Structures are given as C-alpha cells and as structure tokens.
Amino acid sequence: MTSLENYIYNEITSRYADFDAAHREDHVSTVISQALELLDRMPSWLQDHPEARESWDLPVDRNVLLAAAACHDLGLVNGRDNHHLDSGKIIRADERLKEWFDTEQIETIAQAAEDHRASGKSAPRSIYGMLVAEADRVIDGETIIRRTIQFGQKHYPELDREGHIERAIAHLREKYGRGGYLKLWIPWSDNAARLAELQDIIADDTAIRNKVSVIFNSL
C-alpha cells in the first residue's frame, strides 16, 4: 500500500462512519472501486469505439481519481444541502494532500467532488468529475430503494411507515424515473441498462409500492 493509499483508506474513508446510513464507509468504498473500474475499462471501450477517441481518449491520473472518489462526500459533515461544495472546501484545505498533489491537481480533485451531485444542472468540468459522478450512481434497484428509505428515516423521523413509503416513491420518481433529473456520463458504464430496469419498476405503481414496502419491512 502506498503512502497515499494508507492515508485514503485509514484516515479519509473512516470519516464516513458518522454519516447517514446511505453514505457510510461501504458507500465510499463502492464509489472508489467503481471509479477505478470505469477507468480500467476505458481503453477497451475506446478500442471498440474509435470514433469516440477525440472526446474520450484523455489522460487520467489514477491517484487523482482515487483521491477524488474518496473525498467526494466529505462535506456531509456539515449536512447534505451543500455537501458537494463543502467537500471541495475540505479538499482544498487538506494540507496532507499537498504531500502527493500539486495545486492544480488538488483543484481538479475539489472540482470533481463539487460536480458529482446528481441534482447538478451542469456536466462535470473534467473526466475525473464524470468518473466520480458515474461511480456514485451505482444503479442497483434494491440498494437505491434501501438508501432512499434510510435517508428518510434519518432526516424525517416524524413520518410513519406509510409516510416513509410515500416519500421514498416520490423521490425515486423524481430522481430515477423516466424524465428524472439523474444523468449518466460514462458511455461504457453498465448503469444505463440497470437504470432502464429500475424505471420499468418505478413506472408500475403496484410494483414500486410493493418493492419499497418489502425493503422497508426488512430494515
């Protein structure tokens, strides 16, 4: 393990332990592994899609991507509303990162964290932001529904069972439903097919209510 990896895995990811259940250490570990996997898959996709080389054949520093993925949600320490912007501030203020990165690289890491949020209206400013944003959007129906419910339980404790189910369904439709605000950025990601499957469930009123109810009862 390199000194950077030691810092990331022993000091950065541990900060997620105090966040809500949907954004704890398992979440950041998944985002890190997914971001690096997407990077590793890029060359073979470019080989199969030579017409995309002009847009996508970009140099990517693996360590910069690792740091961006690891730090993307650190701003949750101040709450969710502006966590992407707060993550950028925390990254820029981290003196330890200067041991491995220059000022430009740290700014790239900070911008990737700022740009990862699904509700953002603009595309990420760099391929690092796109990779982190895509990795943060791991499309697994059960995981998404569980995280949605868990977020509601933490932030809306006054709701009863039916209230939590209704809130979860409304959020799923707004974010993941057809025409929802979630955007995917990496064309070689598996997320598009998985999102289509989830959208089929969300579009079926009975199916989505049953799915949310079953997962709610399991928590």
Where are these regions (language model features)?
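Short helix-to-loop capping/linker segments positioned immediately adjacent to catalytic or ligand/cofactor-binding
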Residues: 78, 97-101, 119-123
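Intrinsically disordered, low-complexity activation-like regions
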Residues: 10-11, 15, 114, 141
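Divalent metal-dependent phosphate-bond-processing catalytic cores, especially two-metal-ion Mg2+/Mn2+ enzymes
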Residues: 17-25, 29-59, 71, 118-219
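Alpha-helix N-cap/helix-start motif at coil-to-helix transitions, marked by capping-box chemistry
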Residues: 2-6, 22-29, 59, 103, ...
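An active-site-proximal "capping" alpha-helix that borders the catalytic cofactor pocket
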Residues: 31-38, 82-97
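Acidic/histidine metal-binding catalytic segments
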Residues: 44-48, 57-64, 99-113, 128
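His-Asp-centered metal-binding catalytic motifs of divalent-metal-dependent phosphohydrolases/nucleases
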Residues: 58-79, 83, 87, 108-117
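Short alpha-helical hairpin
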Residues: 1-14, 36, 40-43
